Design a protein with these regions (language model features):
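Nucleotidyl polymerases of mobile genetic elements and RNA viruses
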Residues: 1-210
């Protein structure tokens, strides 16, 4: 399925590999340092990503990408109005309905998730107020491997704040929320000219290094 996810996404797609993400981020860091270009990397972590994704977003995303109605009907059969139970030491709980999330271990789950997150990817890519790091005339804004996303920003306050706005809005329509304890930021290249208010621990570290 290489037609739909952007080139930034390498998870679960044939002929795309996680090493591409590592090489991309490493190249951006080295370029920023060598050319004294400011930049900010945001390593995003979504809370229980596969378990909380909203099904309505799945359906609308598949419609947007032009999947057939027949496939949409099958997805509805597999995921909508289904009942589940919990097995524990041979004991089965009562059945209950699930109205969100994609099943762990289901072969469809990675693709359902990737295509839904593509909504966030496109929003960031096309938002003019969000600027990435320009390497050899090519602007790089993000790197993705399934639910692991790294934003590659130019270090400006505007890019950072606009990114948070889009992520917050996406969270409202998808039920995906950032895990602030696991989301991390890393300055690269030249120092930024604004205070990083989100992470006070980072600000303290920056002050102690001066």
């Amino acid at each position: 399925m290489p037609r739909w996810p952007s080139d930034y996404q390498t998870g679960c797609i044939r002929e795309r590999f996680i090493r591409e993400n590592i090489c991309l981020i490493d190249s951006v860091i080295k370029f920023s340092k060598a050319n004294n270009v400011p930049g900010l990397l945001l390593f995003l972590d979504f809370e229980k990503a596969f378990d909380t994704l909203e099904w309505p977003l799945n359906r609308k995303t598949f419609q947007y990408f032009g999947f057939s109605q027949s496939l949409l009907n099958w997805l509805k059969v597999f995921y909508c109005n289904s009942e589940n139970c919990i097995l524990n030491n041979g004991w089965a709980s009562n059945f209950f309905e699930l109205n969100w999330g994609v099943r762990q271990g289901c072969p469809l789950s990675p693709y359902l998730f990737i295509l839904s997150v593509e909504v966030l990817t496109n929003a960031i890519r096309h938002k003019k107020e969000i600027c990435g790091v320009i390497v050899k005339d090519k602007e790089i804004k993000l790197s993705q491997y399934a639910n692991d996303m790294t934003l590659i920003l130019d270090g400006s306050e505007e890019s950072f704040l606009e990114s948070l706005k889009i992520i917050d809005y996406f969270g409202k329509i998808s039920s995906l929320r950032l895990n602030s304890k696991k989301t991390e930021a890393l300055w690269i290249g030249a120092s930024a000219d604004w205070d990083f208010k989100l992470c006070p621990e980072m600000a303290k570290k920056k002050q102690s290094e001066r």
